[in-house]
Amino acid sequence: MEGRLVSKKEIVAMILAGGQGSRLGVLTKNLAKPAVPFGGKYRIIDFPLSNCSNSGIYTVGVLTQYKPLKLNEHIGIGDTWDLDRRDGGVSILPPYQKEKGGDWYKGTANAIYQNIEFIERYDPEYVLILSGDHIYKMDYDKMLEMHKQKEADATIAVINVPMHEASRFGIMNTNEDLSIYEFEEKPEHPKSTNASMGIYIFNWKILKKFLEEDELDQSSSNDFGKNIIPKMLNSGKKLIAYPFNGYWKDVGTIESLWEANMDLLKYEDELSLYDSEWKIYSANPVRPAQFIGKDAEIKSSLTVEGCIVHGKVENSVLFQGVYVGKGAIVKDAVIMPNTKIEDNVLIEKAIIGSEAIVCKGCKIGDGNKISVIASKEVVIGSKEVIEECAMVK
């Protein structure tokens, strides 16, 4: 065994959090995708970390790579998620120089391969692989229970998607007993609607063997979906699908990030952030109570600590420290922390990055496409219309 055994654990979670998030454009110019703010007071990484803590999994590795500073600062020692533990806890795992050289993480499987030594310190029976950029709540302990009952070598969480969307996902074709007989990566003509969520439980000793073999394969993309899962199926390993029926969103695009924030404003919020039985925790700065001015009007919106609102806010999400000036109208928008919206501004269907300033009289968005303003950007000019910052349909 490589390294020193610290303490034997039944399961270790590994969160893949090094993604650049290029489809989020200017929002990830200076930070990793899992560190992008979400839902008024969270960052995306809070969801897998909270799920781990709520599931009783207290040994977690977070694999970082692209622009990790904000992400590292946010996670800290893990106390927000009860992961500040001497016996396990949370560990930040960037790529590093080893005796035989080093390299960036080349794929999801390679990222885990490069951290075999970390996993071996805990000699686990199972390893849980998670994406750091999905919004959902899941009890991983129930998934592990099914993995054991089925005596599986690997269990993959799947969610039912509409048939017309299935070609966008990795699709698991299963038998009646949920055993997987075929995996198709973004098939042109899908045979089922069981989409992989990128959540895996593996028997560690079996996964380690496949990771080591995959690393020697020069033609491999070193990816779980493209390489490891198909190779396990072809070798006759027992793979099981774990159906998930709750809310799940891959917020890897401007459109999906905006939609996920808007979903929180529905009367019956599927994600249910108010559920006291399964809380989503986040490291938040101490802010004064929000202030609502005498002429302010707020409808169907989330506003949090430190907000000052003098204008009109409708169907929008305002993060900490947002200022909305007199006569300003904010509609169908996501306004990230510490952004200042001056008097008589009109914002409609937009995402405004952190610490931006939208100057007096500006107009952003036309209500059709999603407009995006980068963090710390200053939008100036009386009645200037900003429409081409980062549009999606």
Curated annotation (Swiss-Prot):
- Name the InterPro entries on file: ADP-Glc_PPase (IPR011831), ADP_Glu_pyroP_CS (IPR005836), GlgC_bac (IPR023049), GlmU/GlgC-like_hexapep (IPR056818), NTP_transferase_dom (IPR005835), Nucleotide-diphossugar_trans (IPR029044), Trimer_LpxA-like_sf (IPR011004)
Q: Where does this protein hold alpha-D-glucose 1-phosphate?
A: 105, 170, 185-186, 196
Task: Please give the pathway this protein is involved in.
Answer: Glycan biosynthesis; glycogen biosynthesis
Tell me the CDD domains matching this sequence: ADP_Glucose_PP, LbH_G1P_AT_C
Pfam families, alphabetized = Hexapep_GlmU, NTP_transferase
Coiled-coil zones: none
Its keywords, alphabetically, are:
ATP-binding, Carbohydrate metabolism, Glycogen biosynthesis, Glycogen metabolism, Nucleotide-binding, Nucleotidyltransferase, Transferase
HAMAP family (UniProt xref): GlgC
Protein role: Involved in the biosynthesis of ADP-glucose, a building block required for the elongation reactions to produce glycogen. Catalyzes the reaction between ATP and alpha-D-glucose 1-phosphate (G1P) to produce pyrophosphate and ADP-Glc.
Q: Which family does it belong to?
A: Belongs to the bacterial/plant glucose-1-phosphate adenylyltransferase family.
Protein's name in the database: Glucose-1-phosphate adenylyltransferase
UniProt organism field: Clostridium perfringens (strain 13 / Type A)
User: Gene encoding this chain?
Assistant: glgC
